[in-house]
Amino acid sequence: MPFTQFKSLGDVLKTYNIKYIEDNFKIESQIKVPKHLVTDLNFTLKNIAYDVSEASICENLIYPILRSVWMPYVDIFSLWSHKPIEYDTFLSGIPDYLISKRSDLGKIVFEVPCIAVVEAKKK
């Protein structure tokens, strides 16, 4: 069942017996933003119709930022774009991006645990 078949987060929590907890999640770290990323993003914002579609936003804004943040951790994590995942027959889908443990078997092998990264939508 695609992620969208669940009507609420509560439905997922009940179905999979997951405990919901809210807390502050803040890891303080110094990240130096590469100059080329700033240059590329400024170019995109000025010259590309980046907000005409979900795909355009993903390709022109979200992915370059994720890739830049991920690059220093390339030996530890893998970055996946629009990779189908399936927990079981009831919970499956295609998140915009996934970050997973880097597999010892190579870059094409998906490992868990993973973090799903999705863009917020108005719907």
Each language-model region and where it sits:
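A short, conserved, highly charged catalytic patch centered on acidic carboxylates
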Residues: 2-4, 9-123
